Amino acid sequence: MTRPPGKLIGAFVFLLLAMTLIGYLVFRETTIKRPPQISVTTAGYVEMCVSCHAKVKLDTAHAANVVGCSPCHLGNPLAISKKEAHKGMVLNPGDLRVVDKTCAVAGCHPTYGSRVKKSLMATNRGILATLLYYWGEADNQNGDYSVKKLMDSGRTSLALDYYRKLCATCHLWKKKNDLPGYPKFFNEKGGGCTACHDVQPKGEPRMTITSFAGDSGNDSKKNRPHPLIIKKVPEANCIRCHNRSGRIGLSYIGIFESEGYGTPYQGCEPSPHRLPGNRFYLKIADDVHHKKGMVCIDCHTQNEIMGDGTNYAHYEDQLEISCVMCHSKNPGTTRKNKKVNNIEKKNGHFVLIGKIDGRQHPLDLPNKTVCLYPGHKRVSCEACHSTWVPQCYGCHVKRDERETQLDKLTIKATAGWWQEGRSYIRYEKPMLAVWRNRVVIVTPGCQDVVTTIDKNGHISGGFNRFTMAAISPHTTQAKGRSCKDCHASPKTLGLGEGTVVEKNGKWRFFPVDKGLNTLEGRTVGLDNFVTIDGKPLQHGSRKDLRP
C-alpha cells in the first residue's frame, strides 16, 4: 500500500484547521450578544459601553449619552464583548494615580490634575513636616514631604509609623474602599477628585458624620448605583476628614466631641449621639454662617482647596480668604488680591450668593464702636467672635512592638500597635496668643506624651512635646465675647484655669491643673501656656507664635 504524498496530508490538515476556525467564527458570530444598534455620544463618538449601561443615570454634564463611559473609566469603547470592553478599565476615574488619563485630559479638566497633586490635601506636607519636627526627626517644620513620596519610598520612622497607622486616611491619594473590615465612613474617604465631587443619587442613603453605618464599604460593589459627579460640594463631604485634630468641620455645625462618659444619659443608657470611632458628642452653638445656611465652599475658594499649582508648606500659605473679604466697605477681594465670583452688589448693598442654593446673604460691616476701637487693632475677628473651641489636653500616645497594626498607605499590617488617649477635652474660654502681630485663638496641638514598648513588654523609650497651635475655630457668633471674658480670665490670657492672687504687691497664680507624671518627670499644667511673669511654658506651633 502506498502512502499519500506529504503535500496532500498538509493540505488536508490545513483544510481541517480552516474549517475548525470557520466553524468557531460562525459559532461566535451566531452566539455573541450584539446590541441592536451602535451607540454614539452627542459628540459623535462610538461608545458601545452605553449599549449595556443605558440605565446608568448621571448628572447632565457627565451623562453617558454626552460623555460616554470610556473617557472616564477607560477600557475599549469599540468592543462588543464584556471581557474585551473592560480591559484596562478603572473603577474610580478621580484616583490621582490615573487622573491624568481621565479627568485631567484635554477637553475636560486639564489644569486640575497637577494642581490637586500639589495641594496640601494631597501632599499632607504641613502635617508630615510638623509631626517630624515636633518629634525631633527634622530640624524645622518646612520640609518638602508628601504622601506620594512616602508611598513610593516606603520610608518610615517612629513619627512616620504613627502617621501611617493613625493619620493616613485623610489625604487625596487614599483609594476609596481600601480598608477591609473598616466602617463605611472610613472607606468613603479619599479617592482623589471623588473625595469631594461625588454624592449618592437621591433615594440612596447619604452618609453624614452623625448618621454613619457600621458596615464595611468595600464588601460589595455590585448593585451600587453610580454616584453623581457634582460641582456643588456639600459640607458632609468636607466633614469626612475635618472631624479630628482641629475638628473645625464638627465645630462649624455645632458638634463638640465630648468626654467618653456618654452623658447626658438617655433612659438609663449612655447617649446615642456618637461619631465614627465611638466618640460621644454634644450639640452646642453652631457657627453663625452655618445658621444662615452657608456651606464650606461659600467661603473657601477653589484655589485654596484644590491648590493653585504651588507646593505650599502650610495651609496658612495656601489660604486666600479672610473675614474682611466679606465684611468691609469694598468686599470681594482675597488676601492674594483675587476677586471671588460669588460676591455681588444688589440694590446698593453687597451680598454673598450661596453656591449651592443661590441664597443671597447681606454682608454687614464691623461694629465701629467695638471692632474698630483703637485698642483692638491687633485683635483678630475670631479672637472675639469665636466663643468656643475644642481643646484636647494631654495626648497620650503608646506604641507596642508586640502587636501589629494596618499601615494605611501600604494596606499591610506591620509591627507596632499605636494607641491614643487624652487627659480631658474642653470647649469654653478659648485661649488667646499673639501670632504675626495679631491676637489669635490657640488650642492644644498637640500635647504629646509618647511611650514605646519593646517586644518583651518593657518600656523602651518616651518623650514629651507640648505645643499650642493657632486655629480659626469656625465657631463664629454674631455677639462677641464679653470684656470680662477676655480681660479678666486667667484661662483666656494663657495662664490656665486657676486663681490669681495679689499679696505684698506681688501677683501669683495658682493653677487647677498640676500637670502629669511622665518618664521625663512632672509636666506643667496642661492648660498653662505662660507664667504670670510672661515666661512661655509650652511651645508655639510656629516660631513667631507666643503667649
Spans of features found by a protein language model:
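Extended, Lys/Arg-rich, non-catalytic nucleic-acid recognition/anchoring regions
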Residues: 180-182
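C-type cytochrome heme-c attachment and multiheme electron-transfer modules
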Residues: 2-58, 65-70, 74-178, 200-204, ...
